[in-house]
């Protein structure tokens, strides 16, 4: 109930400014895909979309399950990998996420979501090395 009220207030403030609100899935009970959809549906918050955090989905019920459940509401994605044990924010391909399968599922979404690489900085990386890794990551998609 508190989440619905908070989102209603945010929507009322954001809408006149042309700002689109998104909620993000998290690992844990509070923001699972099922719970996010329940909040959005019960609150009739049809204008609020979802930012699918692929790494968080990998730590919960899995990426394919999250995409299947949220597919109609996904407007953006946070793209990072992990090994299923912690929110490591690794480069895509450096963890256990099956990216080919995930991207195939996302291609079936009604809208093509924006993709944001959400990667932890590694000490000593240069702008050039980060750009090269980002290029390789987006080639997967």
Q: What is each of the regions a protein language model found here?
A:
Residues 23-25, 54, 119-121:
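Short glycine-centered, acidic/aromatic-flanked micro-motifs in structured strand/loop junctions
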Residues 18-22, 47-51, 74-78, 85, ...:
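Structural preference for beta-strand elements that scaffold enzyme active sites
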Residues 3-6, 10, 102, 134-141:
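Alpha-helical packing segments of well-folded alpha/beta enzyme cores
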Residues 1-49, 59:
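Active-site acidic/histidine proton-transfer and metal-coordination neighborhood
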Residues 41-49, 70-73, 134-141:
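Structural recognition of alpha->loop->beta junctions
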Residues 33-41, 56-112, 120-132:
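Gly/Pro-rich active-site loop or hairpin
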